[in-house]
Amino acid sequence: MKEKLKRHGLKLTPQRLELVKILTERGRHHPSFNEICRAIKSKHPNISHSTILNNLKEMTKLSLISSFNYKGETRYEVNPELHVNLVEPNGTIRDIKNEEILKHLREIVKLLNEKERSIKSLVILAE
């Protein structure tokens, strides 16, 4: 991720490097904005929430990370591949990589792109 940041002209400041480290270590666990803030502020207490948010937005815009909203909280992840985020009854979010499900998901994405133009993300709520 550091190389991608450099390629896009972003400086590798200590705070940004800490954010990259946190996302790399915790990104597959879909941390919330508040969880990321607590983690980065433990090492860089003077960093502002807006700096963290602006960096997360920039990384999302560059497709280095992705974000989604769950129960009013923005969650972040580093998995760029097509996948399903499964929310467990206890609130844990995990990636599903079942090939049969992914096959159907690719078909749905293809149909949506054909009928609804291009899509960036797809959220399905099934409770």
Where are these regions (language model features)?
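Intrinsically disordered, low-complexity serine/threonine- and proline-rich regulatory segments
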Residues: M1-E18, T24-E25
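Amphipathic alpha-helical interaction segments
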Residues: E18-K21, E35, N54
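Short capping segments at the starts of secondary-structure elements
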Residues: R26-S32
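DNA-recognition alpha helix
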Residues: S32-H44
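Basic amphipathic alpha-helical segments that dock to polyanions
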Residues: I52-L62
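Non-DNA-binding regulatory cores of transcription-related proteins
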Residues: K61-E127
